[in-house]
Amino acid sequence: VLVIKKSVNKTIKKNIGRIFRMHNIIEYKSPEDYLSIDDFYKCYGYVCFYKSDGNKQNEINISEITLTLVSSGFPRNLVKHLKQVRGWKVEKIERGIYYVSGNIFPIQIINTKKLSKEKNLWLKSLNLHLESKDMVNSLIQEYDEHKDEKLYNSAMDIIVKNNIRIFKEVNENM
């Protein structure tokens, strides 16, 4: 679980961050894992604990919290549960991004496999099976522009380790 605090006056234009408010709880499931109904309730509990952790009464306003659930697969059972048991709506906003409405705080579900490569190259690439050599070349090109940044280094390490075969193939053809 990751918590991202957003500045009050800062607008996020990135498609996966448009829903963000002041306090954003993010659950990222590894490519081998899936997002279950119980994972949802665990994360929902994290939001409640986070909200209650202020130094004074109602210091963290529930309307300033979001929950983002990130998974490489589409959580069909969870979505069915949210619709049928909770009575919430789950709406596809764009490729790989779904908003859940009906709750007191905004929730989004991100399916990394379905994300647009053009808009979400790095997040989409954090999986075990990169789609193509073109995608690897795009990653390498963008990485070259940011190789001095720790975040890019960390992400690239994970991506290469998870996709060593295709990176070797691309390297041999260079």
Regions found by a protein language model. Give the residues of each.
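Elongated, amphipathic alpha-helical interaction scaffolds
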Residues: 1-174
